């Protein structure tokens, strides 16, 4: 592998956030999402037992889901045959299970969807959750993204795409706005926020960090990986917001 650096989550213990049996039925990206959602819920002082669960939803994006599951189960097919594949392979690997598991572990029974837009998945999820509240579909939304694809296939794929930095200096690896930048660092983790309708938040005395006042989303219609030169569509997206 040309790439020598990745941003791993160290010291994560799923059992601190969920029971062992539940954790065994999730891959890391789902575990991270559930842990982050529970932390966000606690930080927001949101008491789900006092909420209408049908007015609380979640939109959690994941660009890839679990490549590690695909690798592991494919090895089983080659070595032991297709009958030995884990019956939970599909629900372990598919991207929407981050949102699904957040719903299960928070008790949110409202809108539950997943956004898959590569590196923009988390931001798009927050924007779509904002819209759900704005349109009156929910009072509260868990929103964000989760990813865990530091595995042979993930590293090889992004390396072949020439998307990752090949520097061996951790201090000079992730420098996106530097003239010497050479790619990004493959990382993992989750980020979840609690979005809430303003009057609903005020009524329960929530500590409000910030207000989302706009959201824009569009596409370049240009190239599968490269942004259009000139940044016209990026500017248009900001204007839409």
Can you annotate each of these PLM segments?
Residues 95, 99, 122, 234:
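Conserved donor sugar-nucleotide recognition element shared by glycan-biosynthetic enzymes
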Residues 54, 137, 207-208:
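Short loop/turn motifs at secondary-structure junctions
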Residues 1-18, 32-39, 62, 101-104, ...:
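Conserved beta-strand-centric core segments of catalytic alpha/beta enzyme folds
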Residues 43, 124, 241:
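Anionic group-binding determinants
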Residues 119-121, 216:
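Catalytic nucleophile serine of serine hydrolases
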Residues 68-82, 132-135, 155-168, 229-233:
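A glycine- and small-aliphatic-rich helix-loop capping segment at beta-alpha/alpha-beta transitions
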Residues 169-240:
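Condensing-enzyme catalytic core mediating Claisen C-C bond formation in acyl metabolism
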Residues 1-117, 146-155:
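Conserved beta-ketoacyl condensing-enzyme motif
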């Amino acid at each position: 592998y040309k790439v020598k650096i990745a941003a791993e989550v160290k010291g994560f213990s799923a059992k601190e956030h969920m029971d062992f049996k539940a954790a065994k039925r999730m891959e890391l990206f789902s575990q991270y999402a559930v842990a982050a959602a529970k932390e966000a819920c606690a930080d927001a002082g949101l008491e789900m037992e006092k909420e209408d669960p049908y007015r609380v939803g979640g939109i959690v994006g994941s660009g890839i889901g679990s490549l590690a599951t695909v690798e592991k189960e494919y090895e089983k097919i080659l070595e032991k045959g297709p009958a030995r594949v884990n019956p939970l392979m599909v629900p372990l690997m598919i991207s929407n299970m981050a949102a699904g598991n957040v719903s299960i572990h928070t008790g949110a029974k409202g809108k539950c969807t997943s956004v898959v837009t590569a590196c923009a998945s988390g931001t798009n999820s927050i924007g779509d959750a904002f819209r759900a509240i704005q349109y009156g579909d929910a009072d509260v939304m868990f929103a964000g993204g989760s990813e865990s694809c530091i595995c042979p296939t993930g590293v090889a794929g992004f390396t072949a795409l020439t998307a990752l930095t090949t520097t061996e200096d951790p201090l000079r690896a992730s420098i996106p706005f530097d003239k010497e930048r050479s790619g990004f660092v493959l990382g993992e983790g989750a980020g979840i926020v609690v979005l809430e309708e303003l009057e609903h938040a005020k009524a329960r005395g929530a500590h409000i960090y910030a207000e989302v006042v706009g959201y824009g989303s569009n596409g370049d219609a240009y190239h599968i990986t490269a942004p259009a030169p000139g940044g016209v569509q990026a500017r248009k997206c900001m204007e839409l917001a």
